[in-house]
Regions:
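Active-site cofactor/substrate anionic-group-binding motifs, chiefly glycine-
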Residues: 1-13, 17
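Glycine-rich anion-binding loops and their surrounding alpha/beta cores
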Residues: 6, 28-36, 41-277
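Conserved catalytic-core motifs characterized by acidic clusters
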Residues: 12-18, 87, 127
Length: 277
């Protein structure tokens, strides 16, 4: 979504605590020097690159010693709930995920008090803390009026096919990075079928060595899953004239025409230009 004209996207995240790979590990596998970029420069990159990743350990250092303990537990804790609420970059609109539908309304009410203009809180029916690729997702929609509307959406509402959770399961950070790089570099070669053999990806974005994408991976499922999240964010930001399917087309176009790749290159170059030694 960061490659779409008029969009400025700030993702706040860290390392995995309950899954094989978090967004932080994925991006570091693609060469982003997250542990070497001062927090104030991470915020600046939003304006230089139209997108940024706010690496939680660089903003909330007091919580760093807890990371190994959280990872060893293997289930969500209070800190999984707290994370999105302490995003260091204040925004007027946003997409937030919770791992339990019981948290949806509470989360929505809390975020409303923080002064957001318009946002969604989502929970996949299976307990995903994002929109489900497989079926219904619960949505709590809140605007400045303070009214909370609760409804469900499915991939079909976005004009996308459904995919099982098994088809979009996470690999290692390096494998996930290879999938993302392949989608950005070769969007025209993505096929809706499991890979018959491991796929090696040459990543000229960062000149890093990535693990091959495992045989059996359905890249079209991963692609649709990614587009689903981006389309929701575009809708929340006011794109697509209030049409979810049009937002899907916008997200797909930004990948197909290279704008998403260009945004990634800008972010990579900026972070390397400001990293500390």
């Amino acid at each position: 979504a960061g490659g779409v004209n008029g969009m400025h996207v700030a993702k706040h995240g860290g390392k995995a605590s309950t899954s094989p790979s978090g967004s932080g590990e994925l991006l570091m596998s693609l060469g982003l020097p997250l542990l070497q970029v001062p927090s104030n420069e991470m915020v600046k990159s939003l304006f230089h690159c139209s997108c940024t990743f706010l690496f939680a350990p660089m903003f909330h250092r007091a919580m760093m010693p807890l990371a190994p303990i959280r990872a060893s537990l293997g289930f969500p804790t209070l800190f999984n709930i707290l994370g999105p609420l302490i995003n260091p970059k204040s925004t007027c609109r946003g997409l937030y995920g919770v791992h339990s539908s019981g948290l949806g309304r509470i989360y929505a009410e809390t975020l409303y008090m923080s002064g957001l203009e318009y946002f969604w809180v989502v929970c996949g029916e299976e307990g995903l803390d994002e929109l489900s690729p497989a079926g219904p997702s619960y949505v709590w929609e809140v605007s400045t009026r303070g009214k909370i509307d609760h409804f469900t959406v499915t991939p079909a509402d976005f004009g996308l096919p459904s995919h099982t959770l098994e088809e979009v399961r996470s690999g290692t950070p390096s494998q996930n990075a290879a999938m993302l790089a392949y989608m950005f570099l070769h969007p025209d070669k993505i096929e809706d079928a499991p890979l018959k053999e491991p796929l090696h990806v040459e990543c000229d974005i960062a000149h890093v060595q990535l693990e091959p994408i495992p045989a059996g991976t359905n890249l079209k499922a991963i692609y649709d899953y990614s587009v689903l999240q981006a389309a929701a964010l575009l809708y929340i930001a006011g794109h697509g004239q209030g049409d979810l399917k049009e937002c899907t087309h916008i997200a797909q176009a930004s990948i197909q025409d290279g704008r998403a790749l260009a945004a990634w290159r800008r972010l990579h170059e900026f972070m390397h230009s400001v990293k500390s030694l």
